[in-house]
Regions:
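Short amphipathic alpha-helix adjacent to the substrate-entry channel of hydrolases
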Residues: 90-107
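A domain-start/cap signature at the N-terminus of enzymes
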Residues: 23-78, 211-213, 223, 253-254
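The feature captures the conserved acid-bearing segment of alpha/beta-hydrolase catalytic domains
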Residues: 174-245
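Active-site glycine-rich loops that stabilize anionic/oxyanionic intermediates
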Residues: 84-88
Length: 254
């Protein structure tokens, strides 16, 4: 089996969908920033980690920044995997209220910015699910991948190569159309939901619009272009991120 297929199968076993009582009893205190450090060997075992050694050395420490949603929900949260163009994966302050309201765990890898090779960034983003599963409970039916600028381009690769893992994606000021020779299941991609979030002053606006239109032409009908008035090449505020996530959640199970 292809490494990507093996990893996808492994990730699909991570999500835990729990009853109200078991979730309330098991989940740690929320509304907090957390930090995870581990290696591919610890997450995958020696044999599986060896398959990725050319991308990530088996003894290399990988770290992620996490925000656990602070709310009174009795339901297991979904997951929002963020790929930053910068070295830090930490959530920006205005987005905490979005994660609280949408009941999503935020996780972003450190040392996964634009200077890092794309394959490594993709592995860090997908392994985020495994890392979370060792510590927290979440609903695997509500998984979103997102990224900004170059991170948005990487998120678009992750979304197209792991459509069975991530049911939705928010591409912020950067996205690529999928390559069919790298996408195992285009039909599954077309079932998912996508938001192309950009601004009227973003230098990538035209490219984002073209990629969005390419998605529609390919049959990804559940796609939305969200253009923020006055926004340049930047992260959206809480209101616009909420609009994007609300659109994705329209297709999520209750």
């Amino acid at each position: 089996m292809h490494c990507g297929s093996r990893l996808a199968a492994s990730l699909l076993g991570c999500g835990l969908i729990l009853s109200v009582n078991s979730f309330a009893d098991a989940q740690p205190a929320a509304g907090l920033d957390q930090h995870i450090e581990t290696t591919t060997t610890e997450l995958l075992g020696e044999e599986e980690a060896a398959r990725y050694r050319r991308i990530v050395p088996t003894d290399k420490t990988i770290s992620w920044e996490i925000y656990l949603p602070g709310n009174d929900s009795s339901e297991a949260p979904g997951v929002f995997v963020y790929i930053s163009p910068r070295a830090s994966g930490k959530i920006i302050s205005p987005w905490r209220e979005v994660m609280d309201r949408e009941n999503l765990i935020y996780i972003g890898a450190n040392k996964s910015g634009n200077r890092i090779h794309t394959n490594r960034r993709m592995v860090f983003a997908t392994l985020a699910i495994k890392a979370l599963a060792t510590r927290y409970l979440f609903d695997a039916r509500k998984m979103i991948v997102s990224g900004f600028s170059g991170g948005g381009r990487v998120a678009s690769l992750v979304a197209s190569q792991y459509p069975e893992v991530f049911q939705g994606a928010v591409y912020i000021c950067g996205a690529n159309f999928w390559k069919e020779n790298q996408t195992r299941d285009v039909e599954r991609v077309l079932q998912n939901r996508f938001v192309f979030l950009t601004g009227t002053q973003d230098f990538n606006l035209l490219e984002m619009r073209r990629t969005y239109e390419h998605y529609l032409e390919a049959g990804a009908k559940n796609s939305m272009l969200l253009v923020v008035p006055g926004m340049s090449h930047d992260l959206p505020d809480a209101d616009y991120l909420t609009k994007a996530i609300d659109y994705l959640m329209e297709g999520a199970p209750p």
